[in-house]
Amino acid sequence: MNLRKNVIRSVLRGARPLFASRRLGIAGRRVLLATLTAGARAPKGTRFQRVSIAGVPVQRVQPPHAATSGTLIYLHGGAYALGSARGYRGLAAQLAAAAGMTALVPDYTRAPHAHYPVALEEMAAVYTRLLDDGLDPKTTVIAGDSAGGGLTLALAMALRDRGIQAPAALGLICPWADLAVDIEATRPALRDPLILPSMCTEWAPRYVGSSDPRLPGISPVYGDMSGLPPIVMQTAGDDPICVDADKIETACAASKTSIEHRRFAGMWHDFHLQVSLLPEARDAIADLGARLRGHLHQSQGQPRGVVK
């Protein structure tokens, strides 16, 4: 294990008591997460514009020299309660640059001010409005990390069930997709330096509210995976949430839905946020971007390059 990776792991472990402490409050932990996400710096020359789509604030992210080959709709993480579009726009910019796309990062309403299904319905409204305004779904991908990864999968299921044109592909980074195990406090502990199962147990009820946590809109691992766009998924071996990805992969195999799953051994939840510091994170973002871009070519009927 290299020195830089060791240092980052130690920093995250040092921050864990603050994230786990309810005494800090939601506002305090939002500030703490914003400090960590700031480590994902956008490529130099990236342009940002704040817009509104279907009444939802959105960060429009244009990486430098990015080809206008497609649109990345990026749903940020943060346990449905802590993250923000501004805080995650650096990560979205890195992925957009790797994929050669422009990114849109919606600021969905967070828990506990809004429970399920508010965020899901807002994202469905944003996507539908974009289609109405001329967005081509064949050159569009939806991606997200952690809670945003679960929301990405739930959104794709909702679009399918409503007969709305699907995007070309989905990108899932360490998806939090089974909140039922957290309501029941049965998530296993692994070696993640930051994430503890007890944190998931705290945050899941804030989003679930009085709903059934096994609803596919909340925990898409319990939903029907058939008829979904191709999925590109990346996970971390030390992340206790990685078991959700295993359930997704198993369900996709059963329904014959295309899925590419790459697990990074010895890495932690959302290590992609250290893209400006860690070679492993840069490799992950470059690989995810290339694979998502490849699905655009495939959906347009163009020859698809081999992605290794």
Curated annotation (Swiss-Prot):
Keywords, ordered alphabetically: Hydrolase, Signal
Active site, UniProt feature: S146, D239, H269
Motif Involved in the stabilization of the negatively charged intermediate by the formation of the oxyanion hole: where in chain: 76-78
Induction entry: Expression is controlled by VirS. Induced at acidic pH and in macrophages.
Gene3D superfamilies per UniProt: alpha/beta hydrolase (3.40.50.1820)
Enzyme Commission (EC) number: 3.1.1.-
UniProt GO BP: biological process involved in interaction with host; response to acidic pH
Signal peptide annotation: 1-40
The keyword Mitochondrion appears for this protein: no
Description of the deletion phenotype: Inactivation of the mymA operon causes altered cell wall structure, reduced contents and altered composition of mycolic acids along with the accumulation of saturated C24 and C26 fatty acids, and enhanced susceptibility to antibiotics, detergents and acidic pH. Also impairs ability to survive in macrophages.
GO molecular function annotation: triacylglycerol lipase activity
This protein's record includes keyword Hydrolase: yes
Pfam families from the UniProt entry: Abhydrolase_3
Gene Ontology CC: plasma membrane
EC supergroup of this enzyme: hydrolase
Family: Belongs to the 'GDXG' lipolytic enzyme family.
Stated role: Required for maintaining the appropriate mycolic acid composition and permeability of the envelope on its exposure to acidic pH.
Name by which UniProt lists this protein: Putative acetyl-hydrolase LipR
The organism of origin for this protein: Mycobacterium tuberculosis (strain ATCC 25618 / H37Rv)
